[in-house]
Amino acid sequence: MSTTSTAIDLSTLNPNLSTLPPRNPEHNPLFIFQKCKDEKRPVFIAGPMVRYSKLPFREICRYYKTDIVYTPMILAREFVRNEVARLSDFSTNEFDRSVIVQIGANNVTDLIKMVDMIHPYVDGIGLNCGCPIKEQVREGIGAALMSEPEK
């Protein structure tokens, strides 16, 4: 586990260009699932946890051989509009691989903008459709999306 790596500052980058090396196809979650199936072993996944699944926690999970890690839910609306939110909500480094960002969004426009900004830095993108937190549901995020699937 490396704690001396430098986090990537997303606020200074062109959202369509990555300064990281190209993503390795072996870090793709689908590849990992197939590999684990071939090895006849379970896939070890550290699911998203509010406030805890940030980079230092993901590094600890890697140390203990976790195959796939998630970020905590990041609100697309705040991420695309606010540099402070980008800097506090997501950081990564060259060792942060097989990572899936979990996005909370209530509209397609913010979702697409966030995906455009973050996709060079992650190996998968998940839309949160299950968070039952009242504040999120009230905003039309998380579990609220299941009540209006056409949205």
Residue ranges: model-predicted function:
Residues 20-36, 49-118:
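Glycine-rich, positively charged N-terminal anion/phosphate-binding segment
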Residues 1-39:
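Eukaryotic N-terminal low-complexity, Ser/Thr- and Lys/Arg-rich leader segments
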Residues 42-44:
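Extreme N-terminal starter segment of soluble prokaryotic enzymes
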Residues 96-151:
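Active-site beta->alpha loop and helix N-cap motifs at the rims of alpha/beta catalytic domains
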